[in-house]
């Protein structure tokens, strides 16, 4: 499925196949900073030609429908972990997996100027999550390239005093989620390793108060096909998948 081109009013407009937002197109030798997101970085690894055509030539790939149910599970997980963050207590799944020494990281509060030019207080974790205008950012060496990405969560290992990169993943598969098979090379899950590595790289360049752990996790929730039917409720299994940062 692909979506049709619409304007901000929801009206159908001509689809030219070219990006009309010039700031998204890199001009050779430009002096202004240019942002490259985590998804674009992943595209560069998978298809350098696609990356070049999109960011330099301005070609637009067909849009895809948004997965709102996945977004909702992300939102609910963030609320759950934020409650643990506020109390600096390990999440129930961390306790279940023998990781009581890990808690959601409380990075404190900062002030952000919003689109209305108003100064607002934000939790720093929410700044890091907001990929559109903020997120994790790191200027690549002596260039004008800014690598940027919105992270789902950051945990703190209280034993090692290191920060842990975390991403939430939602799915519905009849197969059991397992550490042994999750990163099977025949599947697309391998790209999630790049995602975790990318976030860790950004954080290492941000000069944070703690070091960045080589351990990272995917918090995978898998929708279950249960015999009793829907009944206005979906049940999920929850699995922590470990990845050693490369």
Per-region residue spans from a language model:
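Metal-dependent nuclease catalytic cores that hydrolyze phosphodiester bonds in DNA/RNA
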Residues: 1-162
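Metal-dependent nuclease catalytic regions and adjoining charged, substrate-binding loops involved
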Residues: 2-20, 27-29, 35-36, 200-246
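A structural signal for short, well-ordered beta-strand segments and their strand-loop junctions
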Residues: 43, 52, 155, 164-168, ...
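Conserved catalytic cores of phosphodiester-cleaving nucleases, focusing on short active-site segments
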Residues: 47, 147-183, 199
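Short catalytic/ligand-binding loop motif for oxyanion handling, primarily in non-cytosolic enzymes
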Residues: 52-53, 60-62, 172-177, 225-228
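Hydrophobic/aromatic-lined pockets within catalytic cores
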Residues: 57, 86, 170-173, 201-208
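Short histidine-centered catalytic/ligand-binding loop motif
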Residues: 66-70, 176-190, 234-240
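Acidic, metal/cofactor-coordinating or nucleic-acid-engaging core segments within structured domains
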Residues: 185-209
């Amino acid at each position: 499925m692909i979506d049709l081109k619409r304007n901000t009013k929801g009206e159908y407009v001509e689809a030219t196949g070219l990006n009309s937002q010039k700031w998204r197109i890199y001009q050779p030798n430009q002096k202004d900073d240019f942002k490259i997101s985590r998804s674009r970085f992943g595209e560069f690894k998978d298809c350098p030609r696609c990356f070049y055509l999109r960011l330099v030539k301005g070609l637009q790939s067909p849009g895809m429908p948004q997965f709102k149910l996945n977004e909702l599970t992300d939102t609910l997980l963030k609320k759950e972990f934020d409650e643990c963050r506020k109390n600096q207590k390990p999440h129930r799944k961390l306790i279940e997996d023998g990781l009581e020494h890990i808690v959601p990281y409380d990075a404190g509060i900062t002030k952000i100027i919003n689109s209305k030019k108003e100064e607002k207080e934000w939790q720093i974790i929410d700044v890091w999550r907001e990929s559109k205008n903020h997120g994790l950012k790191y200027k690549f060496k002596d260039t004008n390239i800014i690598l940027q990405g919105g992270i789902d969560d950051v945990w703190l290992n209280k034993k090692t005093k290191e920060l842990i990169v975390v991403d939430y993943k939602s799915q519905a598969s009849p197969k059991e989620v397992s550490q042994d098979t999750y990163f099977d090379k025949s599947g697309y899950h391998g790209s999630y390793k790049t995602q975790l590595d990318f976030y860790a790289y950004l954080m290492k360049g941000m000069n944070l108060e703690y070091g960045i752990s080589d351990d990272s996790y995917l918090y995978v929730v898998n929708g279950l096909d249960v015999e009793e039917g829907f009944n206005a409720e979906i049940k999920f299994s929850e699995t922590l998948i470990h990845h050693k940062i490369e």
